């Protein structure tokens, strides 16, 4: 029993460390702000993040300054304007067939993906040589204009795919079902990653919080919409 308690305590510490490293509480506050402002907040996690740390190591009596890279789980807030669930999902995105997430990344962030497991390093290098294909200005969620000339547009897909299509790109399914839950990443119209969904249930690594629920849709109603009628009465 004591050994089980000690193991559980060590695992709890490991989970807490991962949450702190990914600034989980800060991301949740940002997500709640989205909820109050526009009615919905989106959070993603857990998903793999490459983390780098510099430490001193004593090797044979000689101290060396080494750089360590690890893949750690993380969570983050997603801009609701960059998240596109299946329109037929109803009030829960997990009832839909797919989700799309759009990200704008710098060339440095793209280079960091080369060493991450599951990514096609050669396709990423080709995309870096091509440069960003997004050349027009884009509108931010707060209404301001943001230049995307130096940013790459990345699309992340989770959903049901034909088993034959997955096998064509080298992904073997675990049973004879005609469809399987998969994850794919597109960069500059290049397929840089395809793999089966790590969730056996086929659920997506996203959650949507609605400030005030609206029937038949995952998106909620924010504070400004809630007080519209009283504000009109006062005006």
Question: How would you describe each model-predicted region?
Answer:
Residues 1-235:
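Extended alpha-helical, oligomerization-prone segments that build pores/tubes and scaffolds
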């Amino acid at each position: 029993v004591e050994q089980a308690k000690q193991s559980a305590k060590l695992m709890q510490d490991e989970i807490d460390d991962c949450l702190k490293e990914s600034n989980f509480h800060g991301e949740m506050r940002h997500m709640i702000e989205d909820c109050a402002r526009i009615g919905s907040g989106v959070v993603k996690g857990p998903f793999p993040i490459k983390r780098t740390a510099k430490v001193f190591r004593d090797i044979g009596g000689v101290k060396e300054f080494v750089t360590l890279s690890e893949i750690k789980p993380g969570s983050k807030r997603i801009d609701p304007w960059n998240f596109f669930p299946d329109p037929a999902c109803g009030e829960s995105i997990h009832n839909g067939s797919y989700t799309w997430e759009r990200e704008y990344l710098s060339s440095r962030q793209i280079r960091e993906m080369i060493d991450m497991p599951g990514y096609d390093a050669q396709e990423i290098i080709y995309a870096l040589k091509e440069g960003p294909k997004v050349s027009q200005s884009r509108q931010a969620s707060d209404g301001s204009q943001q230049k995307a000339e130096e940013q790459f547009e990345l699309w992340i897909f989770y959903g049901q795919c034909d088993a034959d299509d997955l096998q064509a790109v080298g992904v073997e399914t675990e049973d004879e079902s005609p469809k399987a839950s998969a994850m794919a990443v597109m960069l500059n119209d290049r397929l840089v990653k395809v793999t089966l969904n790590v969730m056996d249930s086929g659920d997506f690594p996203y959650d949507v919080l609605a400030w005030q629920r609206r029937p038949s849709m995952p998106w909620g109603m924010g504070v400004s919409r809630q007080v519209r009628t009283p504000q009109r009465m006062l005006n």
